[in-house]
UniProtKB/Swiss-Prot annotation:
SUPFAM superfamilies: PRTase-like
UniProt GO cellular component terms: cytoplasm
Keywords for the protein's UniProt record, in alphabetical order: Glycosyltransferase, Magnesium, Pyrimidine biosynthesis, Transferase
Residues annotated for 5-phospho-alpha-D-ribose 1-diphosphate binding in this entry: 26, 73-74, 100-101, 104, 106, 127-135
Annotated protein name in UniProt: Orotate phosphoribosyltransferase
Residues annotated as binding orotate: T131, R160
Keyword Phosphoprotein: no
Pathway where this protein functions: Pyrimidine metabolism; UMP biosynthesis via de novo pathway; UMP from orotate: step 1/2
Single GO MF descriptor: orotate phosphoribosyltransferase activity
Cofactor(s) the protein requires to work: Mg(2+)
C-alpha cells in the first residue's frame, strides 16, 4: 500500500472522521463504521485533505482536465482545497466549480460558483463519500446543462465498497452509466487491512470483535 494511503487512514482517525461502533446509514443500513467528513474543520486539516486528493488524482489521472467540480454542499470547500493542492504540489493550475442548491434571485443569479462551464471543458468531480451515488446522479444533469462538457472522472475519499442500486458498487454503477473513471484515496478493504490489530495513538482501532462485525456487514451489503 502506498505511503500516502497509510497516512490518510491515520489522518481520518486523528480527525474523528472514521469511527467504528453502531451507526445507521442514510439508506437505513446498520453499519459498524462511519465516515463523517464534516469533522474536517481546521485550515490545516483541509489543507492536508486537499493534498491527499491531489496525490490520488495524480496517481490515477493524466492532466486531462481543466475544472475540478465539487457538488454542494461539502464539495464546495473540497473543490477549492483540491485545486490549491494540485497547484502547490504539482504545478497543475486548474479552476474550481461548484453548484448552488438554491438559485439566488439577486446579484450573481447563476447556479454555479467559481468557474463557469463552457463547451470543451473537461471536468473532474470530487466528492467525499459515495454510498448510493445519489449526489452524482443529481449533479450530472447540472453539469451537462452547461454545454458540451466532458466529465472525465470522479474522485472520492473512501470507497465503502457497498452495493449501490443493484449488486454492484455505486462507483461501478456510475462508471457504467456515465463512462468515466472513478477512484478513491482508499478503499474500506485497505482501511481494514491496515488498521486490523494496529495501534493508532496507543489504541487498537480494529480488534477481532470489530473485524468480525465488519466481515458480517460485507457479507450482506458488500458489492459483488
Amino acid at each position: 500500500m502506498e505511503a500516502y494511503k497509510k497516512e490518510f487512514i491515520e489522518f481520518m482517525i486523528e480527525c474523528g472522521v472514521l469511527t467504528f461502533g453502531d451507526f445507521v446509514t442514510k439508506s437505513g443500513r446498520n453499519t459498524p463504521f462511519f465516515v463523517n467528513t464534516g469533522n474536517y474543520k481546521t485550515g490545516s486539516q483541509l489543507k492536508r485533505l486537499g493534498e491527499y486528493y491531489a496525490e490520488a488524482i495524480k496517481a490515477n489521472y493524466k492532466d486531462d482536465y481543466n475544472i475540478v467540480f465539487g457538488p454542494a454542499y461539502k464539495g464546495i470547500p473540497l473543490s477549492v482545497t483540491v485545486t490549491m493542492a494540485l497547484s502547490d504540489k504539482y504545478g497543475i493550475d486548474v479552476s474550481y466549480c461548484s453548484n448552488r442548491k438554491e438559485i439566488k434571485d439577486h446579484g450573481d443569479t447563476g447556479i454555479l460558483l467559481g468557474s463557469k462551464l463552457n463547451d470543451g471543458d473537461k471536468v473532474l468531480i470530487v466528492e467525499d463519500v459515495t454510498t448510493s451515488g445519489k449526489s452524482i446522479y443529481e449533479t450530472m444533469p447540472i453539469i451537462k446543462e452547461q454545454g458540451n462538457v466532458d466529465v472525465v472522472g470522479l474522485v472520492i475519499s473512501v470507497n465503502r465498497m457497498e452495493k449501490g442500486q443493484g449488486e454492484k458498487s455505486a462507483l461501478v454503477e456510475l462508471e457504467e452509466k456515465y463512462g468515466f473513471k472513478s477512484c478513491a484515496i482508499v478503499t474500506m478493504t485497505e482501511v481494514v487491512k491496515y488498521l486490523y490489530n494496529k495501534e493508532v495513538n496507543g489504541k487498537v482501532i480494529i480488534n477481532d470483535e470489530v473485524k468480525t462485525r465488519i466481515d458480517e456487514y460485507y457479507k450482506e451489503y458488500g458489492a459483488k
